[in-house]
Each structure stands twice: as structure tokens, then as C-alpha cells.
């Protein structure tokens, strides 16, 4: 169905030449177009962030939301822990973008400088992207992974102090990409990689995770005078990242075939850890199943009395007797629950962590998440990750999400929410390259606000090393120098962080029995992402959507009448596709307006205050009030006009799916060219648009608007710009 929905794309409205439009955060200065007015610094001044009644709250009782980014260092010329000068500059740059939270990712990586790698070597030396492993805190010159680099730790302390000063909170990830070493005393250490799943039950690994958490969260930052466990600028702590033993079980990664010199296809357990887990399972069976049930399970497994009962492979799941299947599911779930309960008690009791604790994120929408929700709901805060056509998964990945609303990232994220728990999206992106990447930020910001979620962290932002970077998009995920996404960040902050789009009026819930959770765990991928037969996939685009409860009486909302466009119950959002083509999302709220998608093919679709007659095939256009007044009475507004973005000289393959040449600096944009209508502006006697460059600085003279019957018309495209500061004279 997804292929059919995406197959029909409109013919090009007109070919628009791409022009240079570089981003330089070091050159950016305070601007009337900034969104830093949304921040309330210093971070933490109102007390600790808490989770209550399904939402995040500040210490003064006001609602808390995150408009955030991950901090990493994959692209060449980047460092996830910036030097002091860069820390000051980038903290200010993030604040200007409206970013009020950062997720500190990969701090547990080695501190050494990794070699540059070319992900596209098989396609040619220019294919790219050219990346290197992020540099973390862990000293790589020692035989173990248990010591911090003092200089890197000082950088981190200063960086967090600068973020705090600018009103930006931090999210600590504990276990992310750590590479354990021989000196750590971990069995099979050379075969573990990042040790996903092993960390749940390997006793040495559990002890090392606690040691790392103690050293990091008990460390006193000399620039703030506070331990991180005591700093209210820390908004949450995540225990593990994209790490689930249940996932390993459901994806056939417990085979026990990872050995030195072996084929080692995909992820897997080593024989040592498989034996350890199997022993734990048999001990569990002895405590939680009757002798008769164990005898039956032995018979099903074909093992004699006295021999350990093995865990099944994924291929056996669909036909497995319920007694055996449910025993394994219950056991694996209990291992996860026990680990997270232990870590939670350690973080709260021994280290004194006061903020919400996240066990792990729902991150694999092509497997059922109902079993994982048992683990997730034991935490304070639910979390999920999603990417539209992730390059590691999709062989073809240059299709518009706006043509496939029922398969969108909104659907894949909404499955992970539950009544009574706050919800964040701590990783999300439309990876580069994509002709349609401009659709992500406005659509996600708008529907996240409709769903009343608590935070969004884009993956990823990377502080640049002075003199070592070039003005180009460095890898699939780095948005730092993407002129389209940087132009859109302040607009998205106003839509989501300020709450320009209203929360849904009605909340529809679904609930699952234990039997349904078991059934979902072995459904085929065709049932993704909800693994809930009969669930209406348009619900999250119309109403609020949550899981009501699990292991309880099942329920499912009744299907809604078919509709195109799909309109939210607030009336502020609509999504139309004309049967899977020419998709367009419309945002129509008092403080923000937007048109996202194939605007030229939908010229009759406008919002109350925004219209467009453009020559571009695809675009994302937003208009947001900068002075807090409704658009029709606002005197200062931010207009963003965004489309395609590429590096100079980039070359696509014959399917226009992947790049055969990553390109070079500078980055180019397709200028949105034509006329933007600003309608129904009360008492306006003049409208002016100041084009801004990639660093939000004025470029060229103001463009004088022309009065037309519906309001005012502004000609855009020359000079090329992705954002404009609108000035209204009344």
C-alpha cells in the first residue's frame, strides 16, 4: 500500500535553479527573527522538571515542553563536546533557533580521534558521506573504559553551563555506544560491539553501567557548583538508548552464533551470553511454571528432563504453542523490568537523581511495541525514535511523506504514547538527501502539538570546530548546516513550544489484553506499525491518540468515516492526498499558518491568512507571529519558504534514490519563487519582507508588498532566501 500511495507524483511545475545559501552559526548575531524569546533562562531556575498527570511540569507548576536537538559529532569538522569558545557561540545559536533542550548523546564513546570513513566506498570515492565516530568522554589510552578524559570533561562542564545560561536544558543518555575493553573484565568483550541487549543481564556490564552513571551524575560541575544529579537544568536521564532484550528476541538475535571468525550476520548473542540467558530462563521456569507445564514445554522443545530448555528462534514464533511462547515472552519482559527497576533504584536512591527517568525508547516500528510498553510504562516518561526512510533500512528513500499520511512518522510515533505518561520524541529526522526534507519540521511540530506531546529532539546537531568545517551538509543526519531545516527551526518552535497549534479536543484510547500483546509479538511486519487489526490509522491525524492500558480489558476505537482531506478535530490542521498524490498539509491557527507539500498542484487550497502562487513543484511555507499577537494583527512575523537542498555538485543515482557523489561546499537551495499572499491583515497600510541569509542576517533591500483584493502579495525568489522578516505598518 505504501508503494502505491507514493507512486504517483505530480509533474514538475517548473525547474528552479539551485543557488548557494550557506549557514554559518559563528557569524549569526541576535536578530528580530530569532525565537530565543520562547526560552526562560537560566534553565532550571523554576526548579526540577517533573512528570505528573501525563505531562512534564516545571517546578513553578507551569507546563514544560522541549524543542530540542541531539548533540553528536559524526560529520567531519564536528565535535559533540565543543571547545569553550565554540560552546559559547553554539549555545547562543541554539537559543536563537528556539531550542530549549539538548540530548547529550554518545558521551560514553572513546575520546580518541577516529579515522574518517566513506560510507559510500562501494559506489565510488566521492559517494560519501565522510564521517567519523563521535569523540566522547572515555579515555581510549587505557586498557579499560572506566576513566574520563579530564579535558573533555571540563569541556562538557563548560558546555552545559553555557547551555544553562541560555535557557537550554540537558538530557543525559547513559548507555549509548560504549565499547567495553579487555580491562573491564567483561566476557567476550571483543565480540560485543556496543553490547546491546547484553547490558540487561550480564552482571559485569550492569556493574559497569552503574559505575559510569555514578561518575557522570555525581560529578560536580565547577562552572555551576552543582552535581549533575542536583542540577535542575537536567530535565531527564535515559538509561539505555535503542536497546531492548525483547527486540533481540523478536528479531532472532538470540541465536548464540557470534564467535571469533564466524559469519556473525547481523546482531546476535555469543555462546557465553546465550548460555547465561538460557540458565536464567530455566531458573525462571522453575519458579513461575508448574511441573506439568515445564514437562509440556520440554516436550515442545524436544529436550529431555535435566537438559536446559532453549529459547526459540524467531522463525518458530508464529506456530509456537501459546504455553511455550508466552513463557518466553514473560521471562524476557521480566529481565527487562528487573534491570530497569534496579537501575531506577540506583539512580534515585544512591545517586539522588530527581528528574524523570526513561528506561528506553520505542525505536523499531516494524515490530510490535505492545510487549515493550510493559517496560516503558514502568518509567516516568515514554519516548520514541523514528526516521522517514532511514538510509540503513530503505534502498529507495526519496519519496514524499506528505503523500502517505497513514504511513507517516506521526503514525509511527503516536503508537508509543499512553494515557497518564508524558511523551517525548528523542530522535527524529528526514535524513538527507531528500527532495522532500522540508516537510518534516512543520508537519511534525504541528501534529505533535495536536497530540499534546512533551518534547521533540531532532537527530542531530553538531557543533563545528573553528577552521575545520565547510558550509555543506556533512552526513545523512546532521542538520546543523542544512539551510532549510535551520530556517524552519524557529518556526517549528513557535508552532510546538509556544503551542500555536491547539491540542486535540477529543482523546481516543485503545487497550490490550495479555493475550493480544502475545499475539502482536508474533504478527508479521505487514501489520506495522500498530499491530492492532482494525485500528483506524487516521485517528492520530484527527484526534488525540493514546494507549489506555495494557494487560487489561481490550478496546479499540471505532473506525472513523473516510475523508480526504483528513481534518483535525480542532479544524487547525488538514492533510489531503487526492488518492496518494499531490499531498498537502495545511496549518491554520491564530498564531501560525502553513502550507506544506505540492502547493502548485493545490492552488485553491489556502489558509485564513496565507496563500501561495509559486513555480516550485514542492515547498514548505510557514508564517508565524513574532510578537505574540494573532497573525491578522501582528506587526512582526517570520515567513519561511523552503524546498530542495543539495550540496554543490551532488549526483543522484538513476533512480534518484541515493547519491553517487555527496557533493561539496557550498550548500545550495531551491529558492521558492513566485508570490506569497498575506491575507486579512487588519488595518495594514504597508507590508514589507526582509530576505534573510542562512545565518538570519538581512540580505538585500526589503521587498515591498503589493496590495491586492484579499490582502497583500510579496514576490519571493530574488534574492534567494529561505526566511523573511515580515514588517507590517498599520
Set out the residue ranges of the language-model regions.
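C-terminal beta-strand-rich structural cap/linker in extracellular carbohydrate-active enzymes
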Residues: 623, 708-730
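Sec/Tat signal peptide C-region and signal peptidase I cleavage site
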Residues: 9-13
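Long, low-hydrophobicity ectodomains and other hydrophilic envelope-associated domains
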Residues: 493-494, 498-691, 709
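Bacterial N-terminal signal peptides
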Residues: 1-8
Amino acid at each position: 500500500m505504501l508503494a502505491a500511495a507514493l507512486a504517483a507524483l505530480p509533474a514538475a511545475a517548473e525547474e528552479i535553479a539551485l543557488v548557494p545559501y550557506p549557514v554559518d552559526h559563528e557569524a549569526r548575531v541576535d536578530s528580530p527573527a530569532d525565537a530565543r524569546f520562547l526560552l526562560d533562562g537560566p534553565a532550571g531556575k523554576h526548579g526540577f522538571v517533573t512528570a505528573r498527570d501525563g505531562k512534564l511540569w516545571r517546578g513553578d507548576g507551569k507546563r514544560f515542553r522541549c524543542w530540542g536537538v541531539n548533540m553528536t559529532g559524526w560529520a567531519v569538522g564536528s565535535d559533540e563536546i565543543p571547545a569553550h569558545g565554540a560552546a559559547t557561540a553554539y549555545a547562543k545559536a541554539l537559543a536563537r533557533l528556539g531550542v530549549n533542550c539538548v540530548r547529550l548523546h554518545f558521551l560514553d564513546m572513546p575520546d580518541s580521534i577516529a579515522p574518517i570513513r566513506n560510507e559510500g566506498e562501494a559506489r565510488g570515492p566521492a559517494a560519501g558521506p565522510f564521517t567519523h565516530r563521535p569523540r566522547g568522554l572515555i579515555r581510549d589510552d587505557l586498557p579499560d573504559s572506566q576513566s574520563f578524559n579530564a579535558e573533555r570533561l571540563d569541556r562538557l562542564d563548560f558546555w552545559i553551563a553555557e547551555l544553562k545560561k541560555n535557557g537550554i536544558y540537558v538530557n543525559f543518555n547513559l548507555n549509548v555506544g560504549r565499547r567495553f575493553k579487555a580491562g573491564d573484565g567483561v566476557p567476550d568483550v571483543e565480540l560485543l560491539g556496543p553490547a546491546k541487549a547484553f547490558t540487561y543481564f550480564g552482571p559485569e556490564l550492569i556493574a559497569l553501567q552503574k559505575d559510569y552513571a555514578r561518575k557522570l551524575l555525581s560529578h560536580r560541575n565547577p562552572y555551576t557548583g552543582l552535581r549533575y544529579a542536583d542540577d535542575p537544568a537536567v530535565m531527564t536521564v535515559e538509561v539505555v538508548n535503542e536497546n531492548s532484550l525483547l527486540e533481540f528476541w523478536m528479531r532472532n538475535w538470540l541465536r548464540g552464533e557470534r564467535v571469533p571468525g564466524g559469519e556473525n550476520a547481523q546482531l546476535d548473542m555469543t555462546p557465553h551470553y546465550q548460555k547465561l540467558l538460557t540458565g536464567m530462563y530455566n531458573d525462571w521456569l522453575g519458579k513461575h511454571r508448574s511441573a506439568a507445564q515445564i514437562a509440556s514445554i520440554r516436550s515442545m522443545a524436544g529436550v529431555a528432563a535435566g537438559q536446559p530448555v532453549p529459547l526459540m528462534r524467531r522463525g518458530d514464533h508464529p506456530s509456537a504453542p501459546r504455553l511455550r511462547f508466552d513463557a518466553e515472552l514473560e521471562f524476557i519482559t521480566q529481565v527487562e523490568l528487573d534491570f530497569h527497576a534496579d537501575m531506577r533504584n540506583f539512580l534515585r536512591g544512591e545517586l539522588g537523581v530527581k528528574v524523570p527517568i526513561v528506561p528506553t525508547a520505542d525505536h523499531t516500528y516494524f515490530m510490535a511495541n505492545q510487549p515493550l510498553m510493559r517496560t516503558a510504562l514502568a518509567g516516568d516518561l515514554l519516548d520514541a525514535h523514528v526516521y522517514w526512510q532511514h538510509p540503513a533500512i530503505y534502498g529507495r528513500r526519496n519519496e514524499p511523506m506528505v503523500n502517505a499520511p497513514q504511513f507517516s512518522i506521526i503514525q509511527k510515533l503516536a503508537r508509543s504514547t499512553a494515557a497518564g505518561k508524558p511523551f517525548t520524541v528523542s530522535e527524529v529526522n528526514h535524513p538527507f538527501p531528500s527532495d522532500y526534507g522540508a516537510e518534516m519540521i512543520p508537519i511534525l511540530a504541528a501534529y505533535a502539538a495536536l497530540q499534546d506531546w512533551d518534547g521533540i529532539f531532532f537527530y542531530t546537531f553538531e557543533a563545528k570546530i573553528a577552521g575545520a568545517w565547510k558550509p555543506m551538509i556533512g552526513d545523512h543526519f546532521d542538520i546543523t548546516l542544512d539551510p532549510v531545516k535551520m530556517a524552519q527551526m524557529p518556526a517549528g518552535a513557535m508552532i510546538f513550544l509556544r503551542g500555536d497549534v491547539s491540542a486535540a479536543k477529543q482523546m481516543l484510547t485503545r487497550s490490550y489484553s495479555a493475550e493480544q500483546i502475545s499475539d502482536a509479538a508474533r504478527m508479521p511486519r505487514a501489520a506495522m506499525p500498530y499491530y492492532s487489526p482494525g485500528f483506524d490509522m487516521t485517528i492520530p491525524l484527527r484526534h488525540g491518540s493514546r494507549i489506555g492500558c495494557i494487560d487489561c480489558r481490550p478496546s479499540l476505537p471505532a473506525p472513523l468515516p473516510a475523508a480526504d482531506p483528513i481534518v483535525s478535530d480542532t479544524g487547525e490542521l488538514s492533510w489531503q492526498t487526492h488518492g496518494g498524490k499531490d499531498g498537502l498539509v495545511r496549518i491554520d491557527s491564530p498564531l501560525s499558518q502553513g502550507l506544506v507539500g505540492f502547493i502548485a498542484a493545490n492552488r485553491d487550497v489556502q489558509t485564513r491568512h496565507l496563500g501561495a502562487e509559486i513555480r516550485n513543484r514542492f515547498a514548505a511555507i510557514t508564517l508565524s507571529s513574532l510578537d505574540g499577537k494573532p497573525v491578522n494583527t501582528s506587526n512582526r512575523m517570520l515567513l519561511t519558504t523552503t524546498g530542495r537542498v543539495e550540496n554543490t555538485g551532488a549526483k543522484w543515482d538513476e533512480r534518484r534514490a541515493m547519491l553517487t557523489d555527496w557533493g561539496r561546499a557550498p550548500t545550495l537551495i531551491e529558492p521558492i519563487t513566485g508570490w506569497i499572499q498575506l491575507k486579512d491583515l487588519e488595518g495594514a497600510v504597508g507590508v514589507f519582507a526582509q530576505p534573510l541569509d542562512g545565518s538570519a542576517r538581512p540580505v538585500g533591500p526589503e521587498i515591498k508588498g503589493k496590495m491586492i483584493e484579499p490582502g497583500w502579495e510579496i514576490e519571493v525568489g530574488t534574492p534567494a532566501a529561505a526566511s523573511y522578516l515580515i514588517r507590517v505598518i498599520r
